[in-house]
């Protein structure tokens, strides 16, 4: 027989279900936002690598009097993990194109044009 003065402690089933429902709602909000943060980080990584590769292209030109068509030969430049860079260059200009598999349909293209003095970086959805 139970002692009427002793009260049992603990959570009811309803209280536990309410807590589980609240956690589920918070997870449903947070998980898609986390994916968006990751994609923005990948996009920033591509843009940064394109700018850094362009700076390295200019350093390469100062040494060789031509631009490199191989991103791996650029002095002092190492691309970030996951970033795909394509460099094309000749004696007068270069183009660098960057993508990342974590940011589908996004591409950055850095185009130099020393004759006009207006190099530009264009990053956009493809």
Residue ranges of each PLM-predicted region?
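Extended, polar beta-sheet/loop recognition surfaces of beta-rich domains
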Residues: 9, 43, 52-55, 61-62
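Periplasmic/extracellular, small/polar-rich flexible segments of pilin-like filament-forming proteins
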Residues: 55-126
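Conserved alpha-helical elements of the SDR catalytic core
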Residues: 30, 37, 57
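N-terminal leader/signal peptides at the extreme start of proteins
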Residues: 1-11
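Aliphatic-rich helix starts adjacent to a transmembrane/signal segment
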Residues: 33-50
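Alpha-helical hydrophobic helix detector
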Residues: 14-33
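Compositionally biased non-globular segments, especially hydrophobic aliphatic-rich helices
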Residues: 15, 44-47, 69
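Conserved catalytic core of two-component sensor histidine kinases
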Residues: 20, 47, 54
């Amino acid at each position: 027989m139970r002692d009427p003065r002793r009260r049992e402690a603990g959570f009811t089933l309803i209280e536990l279900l309410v807590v589980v429902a609240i956690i589920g709602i918070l997870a449903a909000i947070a998980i898609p936002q986390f994916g968006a943060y990751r994609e923005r980080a990948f996009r920033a990584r591509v843009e940064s690598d394109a700018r850094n590769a362009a700076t390295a292209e200019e350093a390469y030109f100062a040494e060789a009097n031509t631009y490199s068509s191989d991103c791996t030969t650029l002095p002092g430049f190492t691309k970030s993990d996951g970033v795909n860079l394509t460099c094309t260059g000749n004696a007068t200009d270069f183009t660098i194109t960057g993508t990342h598999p974590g940011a589908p349909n996004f591409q950055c293209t850095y185009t130099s044009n020393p004759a006009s003095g207006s190099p530009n970086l264009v990053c956009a959805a493809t």
